[in-house]
């Protein structure tokens, strides 16, 4: 090979280290070595590949030629380091600090070291013993760890089923016992039960809600309601409860005041002064200071009197008139009970003193519908205690002749004869 300096050839050198001829043709690609030009050199590697693994000692960091295998922990070091620690008096393994019984010497290639886990490094004299160690110590342990982790995660993925009967013991401080039936054994999940309890807790209970203080009415006399029972809603609304035709009830039932319809489409106005006493035995009447809002935990039974009207679904709608204190009853068109006449004076005609200057007429009377059940906030306890605000019986406007029972039905006969005109619903 001719070795000539690079400047004697007709080539140009660029910054990338390539030589080009003057004809802009690529001649050769060489390394940038000043003053030399390399040619093609063949290299032959003589030797054999060593398949035996080479391990390094953990103490001296040198390749191990002769292993010093410690029994019983089976950790291996170079033979010099293993004997050095034994001579000095350290009768424990330098890696695991386990007591040393003896030290075995093995040549390179006769020891198989576990490399599955970096911290293990236990040695075995055969490949079969090494595989048994890997299956026993590493694969089974890995499966156990995986199954244990799945058991910890599983309750969060699928919560266990809980019976409703077991929940009141856990929620005693949350006042949910009254909303959970104790004898139900329905299997439901815990989130749905909490959602159901939260909804029942947020719903207003009609039978335990107390009326607002500004709408509580106090009458100067006990009013007995027979055909309807009034209880308050969330905002003090009056609701009519349907009755049952059963006159054997011994408990006290509220009695409505007498009323009469006006042409079957006008709201009837009645006064609570003329209430005929009943012959049945009742509990002591409520005090005059107690509100009119009666709580009926069970469906009221029908205690029928001459003053009661046959009630069917939908029931009557009652409300108070703010200007005069009258009780206005909306009579549905399907009410076929005979209207009752108003009490008369001694000569048989309405008394002239009953028509006071503060009484209202039918034109000024507000028209109430069946959906309008709220009390007017203008009616206060002061108006209820004032006896002058409760007028006597009177007719508001002339009405076409309607069917009416004889006067003896109101005063002479017993009220038990009036019960035969009522039917169950």
From Swiss-Prot:
- Keyword Zinc-finger belongs to the record: yes
**For bias kind Basic residues, which ranges apply?**
412-425
Q: Could you tell me which residues belong to the region Disordered?
A: 241-297, 382-425
SUPFAM superfamilies hit by this protein? RING/U-box
Q: What PROSITE patterns does this protein's entry cite? A: ZF_RING_1, ZF_RING_2, ZINC_FINGER_C2H2_2
Catalytic activity annotation: S-ubiquitinyl-[E2 ubiquitin-conjugating enzyme]-L-cysteine + [acceptor protein]-L-lysine = [E2 ubiquitin-conjugating enzyme]-L-cysteine + N(6)-ubiquitinyl-[acceptor protein]-L-lysine
Record Pfam families: zf_Hakai
| Tissue specificity remark | Exclusively expressed in testis and sperm, including spermatocytes, round and elongated spermatids, and Leydig cells.
Skewed-composition ranges (Pro residues) = 398-408
Mind telling me which InterPro entries this protein's record contains? HAKAI-like_RING-HC, HAKAI/CBLL2, Znf_C2H2_type, Znf_Hakai, Znf_RING, Znf_RING/FYVE/PHD, Znf_RING_CS
Q: Where in the cell is it found?
A: Cytoplasm
ZnF locations on chain (C2H2-type): 112-138
One Gene Ontology BP term is: regulation of cell adhesion
- Give an example GO molecular function: ubiquitin protein ligase activity
Region span, HYB domain: 96-154
Keyword line: Cytoplasm, Metal-binding, Transferase, Ubl conjugation pathway, Zinc, Zinc-finger
Where does the record locate the signal sequence feature? none
Tell me the superkingdom of the source: Eukaryota
EC number(s) on file? 2.3.2.27
Q: Where are the transmembrane segments?
A: none
The record's comment about this protein's domains reads: The HYB domain forms a phosphotyrosine-binding pocket upon dimerization, and mediates as well the recognition of its flanking acidic amino acids.
Its subunit composition reads: Homodimer.
Q: What does this protein do?
A: E3 ubiquitin ligase catalyzing the covalent attachment of ubiquitin moieties onto substrate proteins. May operate on tyrosine-phosphorylated SRC substrates.
- In Swiss-Prot or TrEMBL terms, this protein is called E3 ubiquitin-protein ligase CBLL2
Q: What is the organism of origin for this protein?
A: Homo sapiens
Which gene specifies this protein's sequence?
CBLL2
């Amino acid at each position: 090979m001719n070795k000539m300096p690079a400047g004697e050839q007709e080539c140009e050198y660029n910054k990338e280290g390539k030589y080009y001829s003057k004809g802009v043709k690529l001649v050769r690609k060489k390394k940038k070595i000043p003053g030399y030009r390399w040619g093609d050199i063949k290299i032959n590697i003589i030797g054999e590949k060593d398949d035996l693994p080479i391990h390094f000692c953990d103490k001296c960091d040198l390749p191990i030629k002769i292993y010093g295998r410690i029994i019983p922990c089976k950790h291996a070091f170079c033979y010099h380091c293993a004997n050095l620690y034994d001579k000095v008096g350290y009768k424990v393994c330098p890696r695991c600090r386990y007591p040393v019984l003896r030290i075995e010497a093995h040549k390179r290639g006769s020891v198989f070291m576990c490399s599955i886990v970096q911290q293990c490094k236990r040695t075995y004299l055969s490949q079969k013993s090494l595989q048994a160690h890997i299956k026993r110590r590493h694969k089974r342990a890995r499966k156990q760890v995986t199954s244990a982790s799945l058991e910890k995660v599983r309750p969060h993925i699928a919560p266990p089923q809980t019976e409703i009967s077991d929940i009141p013991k856990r929620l005693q401080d949350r006042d949910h016992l009254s909303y959970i039936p104790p004898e139900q054994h329905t299997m439901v999940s815990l989130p749905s039960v909490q959602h159901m309890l939260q909804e029942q807790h947020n719903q207003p209970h009609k039978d335990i809600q107390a009326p607002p203080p500004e709408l509580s009415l106090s009458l100067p006399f006990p009013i007995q309601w027979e055909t309807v029972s009034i209880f308050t809603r969330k905002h003090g609304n009056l609701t009519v409860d349907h009755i049952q035709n059963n006159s054997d009830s011994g408990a006290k039932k509220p009695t409505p005041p007498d009323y009469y319809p006006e042409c079957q489409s006008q709201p009837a106005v009645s006064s609570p002064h003329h209430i005929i006493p009943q012959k049945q035995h009742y509990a002591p009447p409520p005090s005059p200071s107690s509100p009119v809002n009666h709580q009926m935990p069970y469906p009221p039974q029908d205690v029928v009197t001459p003053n009661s009207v046959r009630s069917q679904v939908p029931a009557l709608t009652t409300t108070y008139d703010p200007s005069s204190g009258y009780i206005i009853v909306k009579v549905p068109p399907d009410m076929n009970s005979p209207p009752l006449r108003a009490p008369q004076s001694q000569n048989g005609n309405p008394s002239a003193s009953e028509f006071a200057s503060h009484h209202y007429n039918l034109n000024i009377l507000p028209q109430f519908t069946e959906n309008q059940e709220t009390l007017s906030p203008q009616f206060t306890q002061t108006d209820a205690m004032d006896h002058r605000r409760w007028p006597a019986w009177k007719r508001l406007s002339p009405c076409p002749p309607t069917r009416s029972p004889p006067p003896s039905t109101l005063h002479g006969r017993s009220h038990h004869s009036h019960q035969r005109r009522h039917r169950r619903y």
